[in-house]
Swiss-Prot record:
Active-site annotation: K48, Y278
Name the record gives this protein: Alanine racemase
GO cellular component terms, A-Z: cytosol
Native source species: Nostoc sp. (strain PCC 7120 / SAG 25.82 / UTEX 2576)
Entry's family note: Belongs to the alanine racemase family.
Name of the encoding gene: alr
HAMAP family: Ala_racemase
Record-linked Gene3D superfamilies: Alanine racemase, Lyase, Ornithine Decarboxylase, Chain A, domain 1
Length: 386
């Protein structure tokens, strides 16, 4: 790897554990996605939750340079963080915002808001009137077409958009919705949500209201059906090089971006019958070489992976043994008798011909790769690698 972009106050090589972000892979993914879209369709890079654990500022800057048009975050502080880093691209707050403090911050930092109900629209307009904000705030109208989360029911789309259009201080930038089952091989529910979205847009057009932009597709829908691309797609997981579902893997070539690394801090020989870690969940069946790795569940390695996971050392798979502790975990290093303290262990990522992915962890944990990625804590420095 040619160079490192430091994302923490300490030198990357001095760390007990860290997360490497492959910025070339990230750029590749954005460019591949852009090529998959029509020239008229914009790409929003979703960088909420610290860019799914990858580091929001570095990811946002790289994604924009690679061709993303705008950014999506969940909260106002996430948007402010990007503005403070000097990012000028449009930033949409995908989550709910209601308080005067949130609305004032959106205005101050030139963010864009999701409006999901008439009540919220009125609160926004009244608050902006109170603070005497001069220019209108771009807002994105959220419709509920089947997710049963944020948004006004699609059947009331016309009257809802008409209300927002008439309110002072609000400028409608788009109408959008979110799909609940786009990653399913069965497209039935997605098709129904698509139909509802189309009917909602027809309602709005009947009233003579022009909407600058429409967006519906997440990563899965972007890969599954070009009819859902509209004017913009909101892509999160695919930007980070993961596929939302196995049946979508042949649609586009993506490269995983994240690599989680830690160091060997101690190596010892243990006798047969020796218990390892809390609760002695693992008992050595024979004499073994044991190595301690400087990463644990406080860093984002789930304790439920205890005795279920492997790590990579020198391009080989090595089993983890015993209960994963807060700051450390143990591995069976018997296959590497000359293993030395200070050597690097890969928990997620690639070494040689072997690789371990977030999907592997998700399968072992009976969860989803999104949760795995978002679990890596801030005490792991993010290091951008070119």
């Amino acid at each position: 790897m040619a160079s490192h972009q430091q994302c923490d106050t300490y030198a990357w090589f001095s760390q007990r554990a860290w997360v490497e972000i492959d910025l070339e892979a990230l750029s590749h993914n954005v460019q591949q996605l852009k090529q998959f879209l029509s020239p008229r369709t914009q790409l929003m890079a979703v960088v909420k939750a610290d860019a799914y654990g990858h580091g929001a500022v570095t990811v946002a800057q790289t994604a924009l340079q690679a061709g993303a048009s705008c950014l999506g975050v969940a909260t106002v502080p996430e948007g402010i963080q990007l503005r403070e880093a000097g990012i000028q691209a449009p930033i949409l707050i995908l989550g709910a915002t209601h308080t005067p403090e949130q609305i004032q911050a959106i205005a101050q930092w030139q963010l864009q808001a999701t409006i999901g109900s008439p009540k919220q629209a009125l609160i926004f307009s009244n608050t902006l009137e109170t603070i005497q904000h001069d220019s209108p705030i771009p807002v994105h109208i959220k419709l509920d077409t089947g997710m049963s989360r944020l948004g006004t029911n699609w059947q009331q789309a016309g009257e809802f958009v008409q209300l927002v259009e008439r309110l002072p201080h609000l400028d409608i930038a788009s109408v959008y919705s979110h799909l609940a089952t786009a990653d399913s091989p069965d497209p039935g529910i997605m098709e129904e949500q698509h139909r509802r979205f189309e009917e909602a847009i027809a309602q709005i057009k009947t009233l003579g209201i022009k909407i600058p932009s429409l967006h519906l597709a997440n990563s899965a829908a972007t890969l599954a059906d070009p009819r859902l691309h509209y004017d913009m797609v909101r892509v999160g997981l695919a930007v980070y090089g993961l596929y939302p579902a196995p049946h979508l893997q042949n649609k586009i070539s993506l490269k995983p971006v994240i690599q989680v690394q830690a160091r060997i801090t101690h190596v010892k020989t243990i006798a047969a019958g020796t218990g390892v870690s809390y609760g002695h969940q693992f008992i050595a069946p024979h004499e073994m070489r044991l190595a301690v790795v400087s990463i644990g569940y406080a860093d984002g390695v789930p304790r439920n992976l205890s005795n279920k996971m492997q790590v990579l050392i020198r391009g080989q798979r090595v089993p983890q043994i015993g209960a994963i502790t807060m700051d450390q975990l143990m591995i069976d290093a018997s296959a590497l008798p000359d293993l030395q303290e200070g050597e690097i262990v890969t928990l997620l990522g690639k070494q040689g011909k072997e690789k371990i992915t977030a999907d592997d962890w998700a399968e072992a944990l009976n969860t989803i790769s999104w949760e795995v990625l978002c679990g890596f804590k801030h005490r792991l420095p993010r290091v951008g690698v070119m």
